[in-house]
Amino acid sequence: MSTFSKTEVLLKLQNVPVVPVFFHADAQVAKEVVRACYEGGIRVFEFTNRGDRADEVFASLISFVRSECKDMALGAGSIVEEATAARYLQLGADFIVGPLFNERVARTCHRRGVAYVPGCGTITEVGNAQEIGCDLVKVFPGEVLTPRF
């Protein structure tokens, strides 16, 4: 279960200059990176679902963050479908990020009161995400769309 409400996560996101996006298959390495970020003032961290057993590493990170970095929101990134979102929410993700907008993922997150930040590459995608209740989207892919988007 998420430690922070959707509103708390969105407020944290407004107050941070950067959100680290990271994956490593070794839980100990991941913990060391999270700790270094936390000690550097980071309070929002996205661990991406990009490798084998990423969910197991995430489960270990959740326990670590809850005991060692108590005011850090830990989210799961690279989430593209509902079952994976549900798995990370079950593990305790404070927010879900995706490279695309998936209405089913949005509904799953909203039912549980968890922020969903989908990647959007067009104005239509942004509008669709807003209509279903996404308060924040990420411009994706950023290197293609650029800050002018």
Identify the residue ranges that each predicted region occupies.
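Conserved N-terminal beta1-alpha1 strand-loop-helix module at the mouth
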Residues: 1-83, 87-91, 111
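Conserved anion-binding
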Residues: 53, 69, 83, 89-149
